[in-house]
Regions:
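Structural preference for beta-strand elements that scaffold enzyme active sites
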Residues: 53-55, 74-76, 95-99, 120, ...
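A generic local secondary-structure boundary/capping motif
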Residues: 132-133, 159, 172, 213, ...
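Charged (often Lys/Glu-rich) extended helix/loop segments that serve as interaction or gating elements
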Residues: 251, 261-409
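Short glycine-rich, flexible loops that bind phosphorylated cofactors or substrates
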Residues: 130, 150, 380
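Active-site loop/helix belt of alpha/beta enzymes
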Residues: 147-292, 389-391
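A charged N-terminal "starter" segment
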Residues: 1-134, 138-139, 176, 180, ...
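Active-site beta-loop-alpha junctions enriched in small/polar residues
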Residues: 57-63, 80-83, 103-105, 124-126, ...
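Short acidic, glycine/serine/threonine-rich loops at helix termini
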Residues: 67, 90, 110-114, 132-135, ...
Length: 409
């Protein structure tokens, strides 16, 4: 397919025209973002969950331009370190819309965030509460309740959060230490594919709200965390992931109504989307390093497609996902060969999980041919290495620039 036909094909599949045009115009490797698409996804989320406050999970895409675009739409920031707090403020997010969402933080982290003006902190232990009372006196705290992570591509169920029964004890400790026990939070796992996960989390939150009421504690908000899925991923076998987004939003709305009923009064809600906002609005213009053929230990022929980007420079999550690939200039009707897709480094982990499924690629690919890697806008910048094996991080560009190739210097 020609560059033009490639552009029209991916646009029809959900890639925005500006992003497709920028990829087609690029002559060198780069990560391209569509800021208008990110803003539109944010606005769609606000329509689905009216009245809910959005705190963008900065780790998903810590670029100033993305933060500024979201700030202009009214979003805040879920920051996990003083460095992220500083960046959010520089990008124009008011400090009142920044919370410290990481339950893991040192005394110095707490004191520095408090100095910067942050007054709302996540917690999940009485030890952290004691540190907050000392270094962020009078701060508002919300307690993270652990979830199982079932139904998510990444469960995230071990490092953060306390059992529902312990959340009451943590918030009582916060009250007794002079802090404001302001809320509860959950995280149902990243790229959550089921509505049932939010329903189960809401049931746990309801139990905690009842228990808090019996102890005379009333919170003012519930943070429903991240987990909202991107739409353009494929699983490790290459099957498109098709999250039931309408059902997920319906379950969240019903859950909010039920939690307000249990609470018996006003209750605000917060969400912390990351990949849901940015993944599908970022893509990489890469190139073919080499398409090779060699035999496995069992004697079978196997093709390997080595790209100029991989796990260490843009595709960190390639061990759990397959990203959709587009090959401009190659006809979609073939000939194609099944191949293992891998990155350029001298590291065996820099490859798709090829035991699960091979990827059909044009048999005529040559070194230097362009390749578009779609729906990789989440974690492509934040998870990249600074020069592993001498491969530099990809520059980034913005789809709304006329030439479509304006890279970060």
């Amino acid at each position: 397919m020609s560059a033009e036909s490639a552009e029209s094909t991916v646009t029809g599949a959900g890639l925005s025209e500006p992003l497709a045009a920028a990829l087609a115009a690029a002559t060198e490797d780069r990560l391209v973002y569509d800021l208008a698409g990110i803003a539109a996804r944010h606005d769609a989320l606000r329509r689905e969950l009216p009245g809910v406050q959005v705190r963008f999970a900065m780790k998903a895409c810590p670029l100033d331009e993305v933060l500024t675009a979201l700030a202009r739409r009214g979003a805040g920031a879920d920051a996990a370190s003083p460095g992220e707090v500083e960046q959010a403020l520089r990008a124009g997010i008011p400090v009142g819309r920044v919370h410290y969402g990481n339950t893991v933080k040192s005394d110095r982290n707490i004191a520095e965030a408090y100095r910067l003006g942050v007054r709302t902190f996540a917690t999940d232990s009485v030890q952290d509460v004691a540190a907050l009372a000392e270094h962020a006196p009078g701060a508002r705290v919300f307690c993270r309740v652990a979830t199982g992570g079932t139904g998510a591509v990444w469960g995230l169920s071990n490092k953060f959060g306390c059992p529902p029964g312990d959340a009451v004890r943590v918030l009582e400790a916060a009250r007794d230490a002079g802090l404001v026990p302001a809320g509860l939070s959950v995280h149902v796992g990243s790229q959550q594919m089921t509505g049932e996960a939010w329903h189960a989390a809401a049931e746990d939150l309801g139990d905690v709200l009842r228990a808090l009421g019996r102890r005379g504690l009333r919170v003012d908000h519930v943070n429903l965390g991240g987990g909202l899925p991107a739409l353009g991923y494929r699983d490790r076998r290459g099957t498109p992931l098709d999250p039931p987004l309408d059902k997920i939003f319906a379950v969240i709305r019903e859950s909010m109504d039920e939690l307000r009923r249990i609470h018996g009064g006003p209750l605000d809600f917060v969400v912390e989307p990351g990949r849901h906002l940015v993944a599908d609005h970022g893509a990489i213009r890469a190139h073919v390093t080499r398409l090779t053929e060699r035999r496995t230990a069992g004697g079978e022929r196997q093709h390997w497609l080595y790209l100029s980007c991989g796990k260490f420079n843009g595709l960190y999550e390639m061990d759990a996902l397959q990203y959709r690939l587009v090959f401009p200039g190659h006809h979609p009707d073939g000939p194609y060969v099944p191949a293992v897709v891998a990155g350029p480094t001298c590291d065996s982990d820099d490859a798709y999980s090829h035991e699960e499924g091979l990827v059909p690629v044009p048999a005529t690919l040559a070194s230097g041919d362009p390749v578009w890697v779609l729906s990789c806008g989440a974690y492509a910048t934040s998870y990249t290495t600074l020069g592993f094996n001498g491969f530099a991080p990809l520059p980034h560009a913005w789809a709304d620039r006329p030439e479509g190739t304006g890279a970060d210097d």
